[in-house]
Amino acid sequence: MKGNVLIMAGGTGGHVFPALACAREFQARGYAVHWLGTPRGIENDLVPKAGLPLHLIQVSGLRGKGLKSLVKAPLELLKSLFQALRVIRQLRPVCVLGLGGYVTGPGGLAARLNGVPLVIHEQNAVAGTANRSLAPIARRVCEAFPDTFPASDKRLTTGNPVRGELFLDAHARAPLTGRRVNLLVLGGSLGAEPLNKLLPEALAQVPLEIRPAIRHQAGRQHAEITAERYRTVAVEADVAPFISDMAAAYAWADLVICRAGALTVSELTAAGLPAFLVPLPHAIDDHQTRNAEFLVRSGAGRLLPQKSTGAAELAAQLSEVLMHPETLRSMADQARSLAKPEATRTVVDACLEVARG
């Protein structure tokens, strides 16, 4: 092995999945990858399954916490810093890559204190607290969306690392002429109950002759009741609690209705898919709206705020694009033009460049 690399990412799939893509690229180049995470994040399941050694530190977020938690915070942060220092001194990595989550704060500071080159990557159009704090001390600041960070010599717009099998060329789907449009509804692995309620009612108002074929990921707890909602309004739909093969789902779809998480937006561009985006209204710093605007500005998506979009409005917008397939084709072309197929390699290149000094 050429040396150790330490990846820091935790909490949600939006941080962990891009980090796993980078881990595979590091391994392909002959580096041993170790992972720094927290005991409560999704990394505890995904990282061991990927065959990577996982090192845990005790740290949690501060936003929205009560006074008691805020009083304890300095001690907790100091403890997590010493834990991260211990891991880095043990591994002696050639570089540390942080992709977000609470773990990256103490981990990034520990890298700096140990003189290990630090690279950070921000998946969203609005930088998270940890990445904003680490940007001044990082050797490279990678961003998925342009201008997330202030302009500097160390800023690099890379896109989001996305699994290679999600990239589809313009000829991967059957032409829209003479067939129904395929509509994919995604609410994340847990499902988005507002979408589960809105879509059946809206699709019932779409004229039958243009109504799309529907595949709806409703979440494990909501699949049964969502299927019943479709049956109640006499709309045929394939409702699933979870979709494990997203590459196949994207290849099937012609249009997606979904939230606007960073990874979802990047996957839409990789697959060349137009989207109606309903950002999570309570996301930190409203970052999902900013993510969605990236697609909307280019004509690849439409923004539908949850609070102001009812069934009639959604039905009208759906009917418009369903009656004009050329609109969907144009949106798909715009989405594909935004894809960054080299994102993973670019991030890893940046890490190894600073590692070499």
From Swiss-Prot:
InterPro entries: GlcNAc_MurG, Glyco_trans_28_C, GlycoTrans_28_N. Pathway: Cell wall biogenesis; peptidoglycan biosynthesis. It is found in: Cell inner membrane. GO terms for molecular function: UDP-N-acetyl-D-glucosamine:N-acetylmuramoyl-L-alanyl-D-glutamyl-meso-2,6-diaminopimelyl-D-alanyl-D-alanine-diphosphoundecaprenol 4-beta-N-acetylglucosaminlytransferase activity; undecaprenyldiphospho-muramoylpentapeptide beta-N-acetylglucosaminyltransferase activity. It holds the Pfam family Glyco_tran_28_C. One of its GO terms (biological process) is carbohydrate metabolic process. It catalyses: di-trans,octa-cis-undecaprenyl diphospho-N-acetyl-alpha-D-muramoyl-L-alanyl-D-glutamyl-meso-2,6-diaminopimeloyl-D-alanyl-D-alanine + UDP-N-acetyl-alpha-D-glucosamine = di-trans,octa-cis-undecaprenyl diphospho-[N-acetyl-alpha-D-glucosaminyl-(1->4)]-N-acetyl-alpha-D-muramoyl-L-alanyl-D-glutamyl-meso-2,6-diaminopimeloyl-D-alanyl-D-alanine + UDP + H(+). Its EC number is 2.4.1.227. Keywords: Cell cycle, Cell division, Cell inner membrane, Cell membrane, Cell shape, Cell wall biogenesis/degradation, Glycosyltransferase, Membrane, Peptidoglycan synthesis, Transferase. It comes from the Bacteria. Belongs to the glycosyltransferase 28 family. MurG subfamily. It is a peripheral membrane protein. UDP-N-acetyl-alpha-D-glucosamine binds at T12, G13, G14, N124, R163, S189, I243, A262, L263, T264, V265, S266, E267, Q288. The lineage of its organism: Bacteria, Pseudomonadati, Pseudomonadota, Gammaproteobacteria, Pseudomonadales. Gene3D superfamilies: Glycogen Phosphorylase B (3.40.50.2000). Cell wall formation. Catalyzes the transfer of a GlcNAc subunit on undecaprenyl-pyrophosphoryl-MurNAc-pentapeptide (lipid intermediate I) to form undecaprenyl-pyrophosphoryl-MurNAc-(pentapeptide)GlcNAc (lipid intermediate II). One of its GO terms (cellular component) is plasma membrane. This is UDP-N-acetylglucosamine--N-acetylmuramyl-(pentapeptide) pyrophosphoryl-undecaprenol N-acetylglucosamine transferase.
